[in-house]
Amino acid sequence: MSNIYNIEILQIIDSVAREKGISKEILISTVEQAVQVAGRKKYGNEYNIKAQINRKTGEINLLRILKIVEDVEDYLTQISLEDALVKNPEAKIGDEIYEYLPPIDHARVSAQAAKQVITQRVIEAEREKQYHDFKDRKGDIINGIVKRIEYGDIIVDLSRAEAIIKKDQLIKGEHFKPNDRIKAYVQDVRQETKGPQIFLSRVDNQMLVKLFKLEVPEILEDIIQIKSVARDPGSKAKIAVFASDSSIDPVGSCVGIRGNRVKAVTNELNGEKIDIVLWSNDLAQFIVNSLIPLAPSEITKILIDEDSHKVEVVVSQEHQSIAIGRRGQNVRLASKLTGWNIDIMTEEQESKRRNEEFSTSTELFMEALDVEEVIGQLLSVTGFNSVEQIASSEISTLTRIEGFEEELAVEIKNRAIHYVDLKNEKIIKKLEELGVEQELIDILELPLELILKFAEYGIKTIEDLGEMSVNEFKNLAPNSNITDENIKLLIKTARHHGELKDS
């Protein structure tokens, strides 16, 4: 039997469902749960109680659920088949029997349910809806209105939700005030207890990529590809582009007529100057292109060291400052763009460095291999700069050196191997004395000299490695050819290993 309170509940539910865009069924189920709680408080928690609301009349009924069993152990929640057949001739073991319970004060309970539970469920449902609306927007550019500023963080009104731009995700020097329009990149969407958290950024590299996609149709259509990006947000950026169709000028397409396309991106990013660089699978050419505004003709020489993942670019004295850029910005961005550590040197500096390296390696070979100066010089001028390189080289490589017959080549190689073995034995002994775990040596896969350096710094176990930062790792192994991503993976693996040990 329905009454005015029951009808009022349905009206409240209808109104909230329409206004908030929440399923009517979800709200009714929520009220039913509240009534069930009230029923258990009155009749006892030991009862299995269910509330039902008639979707048309709003009538509320309380029912006790009894499970049909062969042997009744709990008379509050179970019923025998014999007793169940009296109530329902078609009853069988495993079914449930519903018994109506005397009504409680539905008017009071209904009002409380409408006021408290619906409100809470609306909040939860809105949070769920916001999360589902925005979780697929991760990686998009989004527009909003600055709602307020809290300790430097910007709270952005997205109409159906709020987002946050942390202070460190804002471009340095830009200022926003309430009601300003703002465009940002959706960096992450997380479901948390207090609701969905939408994190925006204006400094993420992908912000630049997405803006170019908006301005350059050829990028959106994948005719032009963005290969890599490097940014000093708000100051300068470099973006490497490529088109497989040789008839298309990817750089010109991104710049636009009279620079209109790149200017649009620059204006959005608080005046960030952008160099459009032509990508090439020829590393030397890509390095040359990346150093714009330095002209290719102003580069004298490029020396690529694959072992240390370094590139030396030799220029004249007058062009060095252009190549390096203000406070090293140009070469730093070029290094990030290409993924190689680029060092700019003048012709004089390069000549001096080569002479110093030649002298150093010659002296090393004379002492380590017990050879005359002329042999040390021949090894140095051939390109060897460590005893390890000689030890691992082929005899045929050594015999190509002028004056090196096979007998001499074999002797030099054997002396190099002996030197390296003795050196490694000393390092291994030192590592043992320091208590370095073999697992750490295995996972690092670095020369023993570097591992000793790690150990002397205090990194002796995989757990120690897991507590390192990428910068710490790079400072200890500056000349290793391990990329930042692989360093992160090493540290992550070490942390996971430590967690498994603790569990």
From Swiss-Prot:
An annotated GO cellular component: cytosol
Annotated compartments: Cytoplasm
InterPro entries: DNA_repair_Rad51/TF_NusA_a-hlx (IPR010995), KH_dom (IPR004087), KH_dom-like_a/b (IPR015946), KH_dom_NusA-like (IPR025249), KH_sf_prok-type (IPR009019), NA-bd_OB-fold (IPR012340), NusA_bac (IPR030842), NusA_N_sf (IPR036555)
Name recorded for this polypeptide: Transcription termination/antitermination protein NusA
Assembly: Monomer. Binds directly to the core enzyme of the DNA-dependent RNA polymerase and to nascent RNA.
Role, per record: Participates in both transcription termination and antitermination.
Transmembrane parts of this sequence: none
GO biological process terms on file: DNA-templated transcription termination; transcription antitermination
Lineage: Bacteria, Pseudomonadati, Pseudomonadota, Alphaproteobacteria, Rickettsiales
Coiled-coil region list: none
Classification via CDD domains: KH-II_NusA_rpt1, KH-II_NusA_rpt2, S1_NusA
Organism, scientific name: Rickettsia prowazekii (strain Madrid E)
